A protein has these predicted regions:
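Surface-exposed loop/turn and secondary-structure junction residues enriched for glycine/proline
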Residues: 1, 5, 67, 91-94, ...
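FAD/FMN-dependent oxidoreductases across multiple families
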Residues: 4, 28-109, 115
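Conserved FAD-binding catalytic core of PHBH/FMO-like flavoproteins
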Residues: 1-38
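Short secondary-structure transition/capping segments
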Residues: 23-42, 158-176
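C-terminal helical "tail/cap" subdomain of flavin- and related membrane-associated enzymes
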Residues: 111-207
Length: 207
């Protein structure tokens, strides 16, 4: 209703300020996020109507990859890290944790390559092998879940959120981190046997 193929948010930052935003998945929707955000604010759609008079202070715009890990991340004299490498969690569309974590790995690999006077793709490949070993399966599983979520109606989303509300704090953190190891998914499906969780388990268990 508020943000096609994505989600909208209102995050209070003080008594009188808040961050209001929309995230719209491409190519699932051709809606312009800037146009949609202004429409929500100007027409006071949904929860925004409860905020009173709104004065726009700042505007920020960005792109976050959510198409999985289909790209190379090392070339001769070049290492890609963070968003440019596709290192983003498709479920919550954030990647700062990955950027920091694997930025350190990239720095160490690059330093060794420079020390050895060899910055070819072959000398930088240990970086790609390390980060893919750590999170490739998690992100690929999260993409499957995201693809399912994109097709949900608002009512189906409400049912999905009912399931998420039943999770413990640790289970929820694993979920939004896309930590879909088979052992954890079996435990999740056992503790929360509703059909939607079983569908989620079936979707990611083979990765």
């Amino acid at each position: 209703e508020y943000s096609p193929a994505g989600y909208a948010w209102i995050f209070p930052t003080s008594k009188n300020t808040a961050r209001i935003g929309v995230g719209i998945g491409k190519p699932d929707s051709d809606v312009d996020p800037t146009v949609r955000l202004n429409e929500l604010i100007d027409k006071k759609i949904g929860p925004i109507k409860d905020l009173g008079n709104i004065e726009k202070i700042e505007f920020h715009y960005g792109l976050i990859p959510n198409d999985g890990l289909s790209r190379k991340t090392v070339y001769d004299n070049l290492i890609l890290v963070g968003d440019s490498a596709g290192q983003a969690n498709p479920l919550v569309l954030e990647g700062i944790r990955y950027a920091i974590r694997f930025g350190e790995v990239a720095g160490k690999v690059a330093a060794d390559a420079i020390k050895n006077n060899n910055t070819t793709e072959a000398s930088l490949i240990p970086y790609e092998k390390e980060w893919k070993k750590a999170i490739e399966s998690k992100i690929n599983s999260a993409v499957k879940v995201q693809n399912r979520w994109v097709g949900l109606s608002d009512d189906e989303w409400d049912k999905e959120l009912d399931i998420i509300n039943e999770l413990t704090a640790d289970e929820f953190l694993d979920f939004i981190r896309a930590d879909f190891g088979v052992a954890k998914m079996v435990k999740l499906a056992t503790h929360h046997p509703k059909m939607v969780v079983r569908q989620l388990f079936n979707m990611v268990k083979g990765t």
